Structure formats: C-alpha cells, structure tokens
From Swiss-Prot:
Annotated InterPro entries: IRAK1BP1 (IPR030312), SIMPL/DUF541 (IPR007497)
Protein name, entry field: Interleukin-1 receptor-associated kinase 1-binding protein 1 homolog
Keywords: Cytoplasm, Nucleus
Organism: Oncorhynchus mykiss (Rainbow trout)
Function recorded in the entry: May be part of a signaling pathway that leads to NF-kappa-B activation.
GO cellular component: cytoplasm; nucleus
One of the protein's GO biological processes: immune response
TM segment ranges: none
Subcellular location: Cytoplasm; Nucleus
Pfam family, one: SIMPL
Top-level taxonomy: Eukaryota, Metazoa, Chordata, Craniata, Vertebrata
Family assignment from sequence similarity: Belongs to the IRAK1BP1 family.
C-alpha cells in the first residue's frame, strides 16, 4: 500500500477580544480586525489525507468446449452427454461446487447430419485448484476438446473490500498526521468533527503472471478531509 503525504491545516481560534493588525498597513493603524470568540467556538485541526491500495483479481473463469456430429439425434446427444459427464465428474473430484459451473448445449442439423456443441463454464476462486483441473482435462481429453486459458477478473465483493480499505487507510493516515500536528502545538487530539471523502479513483494496476497468463490488479486511491477538535493538555490531566 502506497500512502502519499497529508496536507494539514490547524485552526487555533483566539480568545474573545483578541485584536489582529495588518503589518503591511502604514503604522499598523490602517486595518484592524477584532475576533470575538463565542461560547461554542472550538480549536480545530483540519487534515487532508490520502492512500493507495492495490488488489489482484480474485476470480477466474475457464471454459471447456467441444462438439460432435452424428446421423441421429440420439447418437450425437449420447456422445456429448458422456463427455459432459466425464468433465463434471472430474470437477466434482476436485471439489468444484455445482453453483460454480454452468453447462450449455446447442444442437442443429446441417448436411443431413445432427451437430451438437457443448460448453462447460467454471468459475474458480482457488487458482491452485484451477491449475490442477486444467492439467487433468488436457491430459485425459482428446484434441477435439478445447480448454481455454483462464480469464481473471475482480468480484464485486473484492472491489467493495478494496474501496473500503483504501478509504479507511486514508482516514487513518489523516488521523496520524493530525495527532503529530496537535502534539507539536501542545494540544491533545480530540474527537473527529467531520469526515468527508473528497476523491476516489480506480485504475488498472498492471498484470501479474507469466507469458500467456495475466492476472490483472486494480489500484484504488482515496483522499479524505477530516476535522478534529483540539483540547488543552492541562484539561486532560486528572486533578489530584
């Protein structure tokens, strides 16, 4: 995770009746500002913090496709069904759940023959499991069966976690910076008064993997604006 520096602004409100003069005015008498502090006014520190978090793809799909042609519907259906059942059995042996796969079939007639095409689509979250399944299918099935290369992507759960994580990291970075600033000013950092995410972006974070296999990643950035109240250190000490 890469974190960029925060921009910090501290506002220490003056006490009632404090007078500020413009030093640029001749004799300092030309411009006078009087600030009246109300009962509800408070000392504050305002911080803009940012963070960046990257996350690789957490899902991949692999498709297994094949077709056959026969003179009768029963023959082509039985041929395709046997192959589909073998593939499903292999997937079950490797603990692939039923909700993680779909099977589609399509039959049509051309040139006095019946043609059937089948496609088995599998979603993997365990990439080691995916590799083992692909090796078995490539070894056991003939060349008429096509096993695709994995297509990696980010699930909605992964993207949601990424967005929350980068925002929390930006807020934490802002809090640490505000704590350092308040300590430097001789104050104690109080409760947050305002937290606002000002900017959130996502971009392609590059690809991981060897030649032919690319596992993409996404980089998310967040910039937040946070206001904390400041307390005098003396007020935090217990009276003896």
């Amino acid at each position: 995770m890469a974190i960029s520096p925060s921009r910090v602004f501290a506002a220490l409100l003056p006490t009632a009746g404090d007078i500020y003069r413009d030093e640029n005015e001749p004799g300092m008498g030309g411009h006078t500002v009087t600030v009246q502090r109300t009962q509800n006014s408070a000392r504050e520190v305002q911080v803009t913090g940012s963070a960046e978090v990257s996350c690789p793809a957490d899902r991949a799909t692999v498709s297994v496709s094949f077709k056959n042609s026969k003179e009768s519907v029963n023959d082509v259906t039985n041929s395709i069904s046997r192959r589909v059942e073998y593939i499903l059995q292999t997937l079950r042996q490797h603990h692939v759940k039923g909700e993680e796969l779909t099977v589609t079939r399509h039959i049509y007639r051309a040139d006095d023959l019946y043609h059937m095409e089948a496609l088995v689509m599998v979603v993997f979250s365990d990439f080691g499991q995916m590799e083992r399944v692909c090796i078995v299918l490539l070894e056991k099935l003939d060349k008429s069966v096509c096993v695709s290369t994995p297509h990696f992507y980010h699930s909605e759960e992964c993207l949601g976690l990424l967005r929350r994580s980068v925002c929390v990291a930006a807020v934490e970075n802002a809090r640490l910076k505000a704590s350092e600033m308040s300590s430097m000013l001789g104050q104690t950092l109080g409760h947050p008064l305002l937290v606002r995410e000002e900017e959130a972006t996502e971009r392609d974070g590059g690809r991981q993997g060897g030649e032919g296999v690319h596992r993409p990643s996404i980089s998310a950035t967040s910039r937040v604006f946070v206001t904390f109240n400041l307390r005098h250190k003396d007020r935090t000490r217990k009276k003896i």
